[in-house]
Amino acid sequence: MVDVVELKYVKKFLAKSAVHTLNYYDITFITEGKGAFSVDNQTYEAIPRDVLFSKPGEIRNWDTHHITNGYALIFEEEFLSFLFKDSLFVQHLSFFQIESSSSLLHLSDELYTRILETLHDIKMEIDSYQQGDVHVLRALLYEVLMLLDRAYLKMTSIEEGRSREVSNNHVRDR
């Protein structure tokens, strides 16, 4: 299973309570508005070009009044895992690892545009789906995951560099 859904459509089903738990992987792209978005009790102030990552079983909550639109790329692990020799492929992605430091990634304009175009391609492929023909869908999903993984690794290496700099400054100050 893989799908791309607009947040303004999903919001209708969350009207009574925005707190929910998913049983699939979800990568949410904020396109309009800004507001609080929580993943497993960690709250972020989400703005356009932000991406939020959720694993099955995590508790999510978002400000449906102020985050006005975006896209959710949802998929089950099985959709990809039997394609690769690594049955834990999805769990090995940097943003889905247990020890990942953040569920939030802010994209550059260029990457944001590229990924939104690919999400559009995924939606078109789903709409023209032929029974048993999932290879293009898998390839498009794989492309998005690899682009996000690269950006997430770059973000965390920059953050680690800043952390080491601050740590080194404290050592030098003594």
PLM features: what roles do these ranges have?
Residues 32, 56, 75-77:
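Residues immediately flanking
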Residues 36-38, 54, 59-66:
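Short beta-strand His + acidic residue motifs that chelate non-heme Fe in jelly-roll/DSBH
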Residues 106-109, 126-137, 148-174:
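Short, Lys/Arg-enriched, Trp-marked, Pro/Gly-tolerant hinge/linker segments that flank
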Residues 1-45:
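Generic protein-terminus/edge-of-domain signal
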Residues 41-55:
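Short acidic-glycine-tyrosine-enriched beta hairpin
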Residues 26-29, 114-118, 140, 144-147:
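Amphipathic, well-ordered alpha-helical segments in soluble domains
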Residues 1, 63-124, 150, 154:
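A hydrophobic/aromatic-rich effector-binding and dimerization subdomain
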